[in-house]
């Protein structure tokens, strides 16, 4: 039985989130948590929190055994982009894009 957890509108670009997500896709959850714990990237803390939530959902809602869980799927999709203006020289302005993403983690038993 696959169980999911979703974090929406995380203040992180999807491109940077996918770098970390690719490292833990398909791994057992205990090994994935170890990798995320030692990664220095901002995305690793967010993905770790969502993964822990998915594990708790699987244990509570489905009665799954934690030792048998694997990261079945992990998706980092683009969320809404906030557009801001940065003042530049000679009275000009340039756009600043504050990107966000949606992180979805799916765990299942072997």
UniProtKB/Swiss-Prot annotation:
NCBIfam families: rplV_bact. This protein binds specifically to 23S rRNA; its binding is stimulated by other ribosomal proteins, e.g. L4, L17, and L20. It is important during the early stages of 50S assembly. It makes multiple contacts with different domains of the 23S rRNA in the assembled 50S subunit and ribosome. The globular domain of the protein is located near the polypeptide exit tunnel on the outside of the subunit, while an extended beta-hairpin is found that lines the wall of the exit tunnel in the center of the 70S ribosome. The keyword Magnesium does not apply. Keywords: Ribonucleoprotein, Ribosomal protein, RNA-binding, rRNA-binding. InterPro entries: Ribosomal_uL22, Ribosomal_uL22_bac/chlpt-type, Ribosomal_uL22_bac/org-type, Ribosomal_uL22_CS, Ribosomal_uL22_sf. Belongs to the universal ribosomal protein uL22 family. GO terms for molecular function: rRNA binding; structural constituent of ribosome. HAMAP family: Ribosomal_uL22_B. It comes from the Bacteria. The gene is rplV. This is Large ribosomal subunit protein uL22. GO terms for cellular component: cytosolic large ribosomal subunit. GO terms for biological process: translation. Part of the 50S ribosomal subunit. The keyword Lyase does not apply.
């Amino acid at each position: 039985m696959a169980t999911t957890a979703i974090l929406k509108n995380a203040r992180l670009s999807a491109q940077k989130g996918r770098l970390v997500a690719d490292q833990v896709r398909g791994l057992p959850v205990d090994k994935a948590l170890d990798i995320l714990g030692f990664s220095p990237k901002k995305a690793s803390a967010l993905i770790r929190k969502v993964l822990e939530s998915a594990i708790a959902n699987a244990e509570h809602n489905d009665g799954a055994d934690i030792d048998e869980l694997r990261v079945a799927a992990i998706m980092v999709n683009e969320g809404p982009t906030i557009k801001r203006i940065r003042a530049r020289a000679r009275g000009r302005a340039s756009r600043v894009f504050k990107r966000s993403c949606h992180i979805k983690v799916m765990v299942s038993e072997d």
